[in-house]
C-alpha cells in the first residue's frame, strides 16, 4: 500500500534532477492530467488548453495541451475533460477539535472538499490535557492523509485560575519545548488575550518571545482599533477577527494579515459577506488576506468546507481566480510555504483539485495520488483512513465528576436582582441583563414571564473538588428537559442548561458515562447524544458517522426550543468574550474580569 501521509512525497532538494528531466521531456512523468484549464494562483488567470506533468508526487511542469505526445512511454493519463485544475486549498486557521473528530478522520472531509493542507491550533485539547494532548494530536496528524501543521496554542488557559479551572497550563517553557521537539510547529497560535499583550503582561510577552526568537510567526485574535498598534508592535502578524472596516484598514496598514472567516449561516461565525465587502470597499489589495474556516462541527465540515467559503467569497464580489488564490496561495504565503504548496508551479507538491465551473471540487489528488474521484473517496484513501492513530489511555479518562452535585441554585424567597446571561443570535456576545424579581406566587411563573432557565458549569478536570457554578439564562428558549456539553470553551468543563434538576442530572450523568459528549435530554431520557470519549472533545469514529450523530443532535436541539445552536451554547463559558460568562468559578463580568453573584 502507498504511504499516504505528508511524508509520502520526498523533499524537493532530493528530487530536483528528476523534476528537471521530466520537465524537459527527457524522462516520462508518472502522471499526465490532460484536457484541463489550469487556475494559476500566481497570475490569477485561468490558462486554457493545458496539461500537468507529475512525478514523485510533485508538479514537474504545466504544458500546452498535447505536449505529452512527444514523451517516452510509461505514464498514466487522466482526462480532466475540460475541467479546471487548481491547487489544493490551504486553511490557515482551524481547530480540528471543533469538528469533534480526530485528525485522521478530519482528513476525509477535508479532501472531499478539496482542502489538502491545514494549520491547526489545538488549544482545545491543550486546555484539557496540557502538552500531552497537543502532542497526541500531533502524532495523530503525522499519520493522517493530510498535510497538518501546528500553530502552537498560546493562551492556555484563556484566563486566570481565579476565574476558571482548566486541565492544562501551557507556560512559555512548555511552548518553547513544543517548538523545539516538533518541526511541524510552524507558528504561535492565536494570542487571544490581546488586552494583556497590549498592556505588557510579562507571561504573554514571554510566550511571544518563545516563538519570535525561533523565527516563528505569531497569529492573533483582536477586537478594537485602539489595540492594533500595540498588538502589531508585539509581533502579531495575522488575525481572523477583523470584520469592521476601520480596524481592517488599520490592520492591513500595520502589516497584519487578515484571515476572512467563513462560517455557515446557522453558526455564530457567519460573517464572510461583511468581511469581503470590508476589503472591497476599502479598495485595499487582497494580497494580504486569506480565507479560513476556524470552527466546524462534523456535519457542517462535510457541507461547508473551505471550498464553500471560496464560493461565498465569489458571491460577495471576488473574482473566482482571486477567491481561489485567497483559499490556497495566500495561506501558504503567510506561513512561508508558497514554494511547496498553494500553486501549480514546478517543484510544488501535486496537491490538486479538479473543479467544475462553479468551483465545486470533483476530484482531489494528494501528493500526486488520486484520493477523491468524482466526489467519492478512492480505495487508497479508504485504507489510509482505516489505519488510525490510537490515543493514549489517559485521553479516555478526562471527565472526573463529583459523586454528588446540585445543578440548580437555591432560589431566594424575597425580592432580588438576578445577574442573568441573555443569549441572542449569533451567540458569540452574551448580554449582561439585570432582572428584578419580586416573588409573588412561584418561581415557575417568574421563569416563564422573564424567559429564564437554569445553567450550571461543573469542573471536570479533577482539580477543584468538583466546583459547580449556578446561573440563569435569559431568552435561551429551552422549553423542556436539559442540554449539556463537555465542550465548554475554552477550559472544557461541563456546561448544562435545563428547566429542572432531574433532567440536568440525567444529562450530566450521560456525559460522564461516555467520558464526554453533547446531549439533549427530555423526560428523563437521552434524546440525542454525540459521544466524545477522547479528552471529552473527540469521537473515535469516522467523520461521516459523527456527522449523522450531529444531524440528530441538531434536530433534537431545535425541537427543545433552544434559540442559539449548540456551538453557540458551547461558547457560554468562554470568559474572554463580552459581556458576561459563567465558568466553574461563577459568573464572570468580562470587561472587569471579575466574578459576580447570581442574586443581589
Curated annotation (Swiss-Prot):
Its EC number is 3.5.4.2. Gene3D superfamilies: Metal-dependent hydrolases, Urease, subunit C, domain 1. It catalyses: adenine + H2O + H(+) = hypoxanthine + NH4(+). Its cofactor is Mn(2+). Transmembrane segments: none annotated. It is an enzyme of class 3 (hydrolase). GO terms for biological process: adenine catabolic process. Belongs to the metallo-dependent hydrolases superfamily. Adenine deaminase family. This is Adenine deaminase 2. It comes from Bradyrhizobium sp. (strain ORS 278).
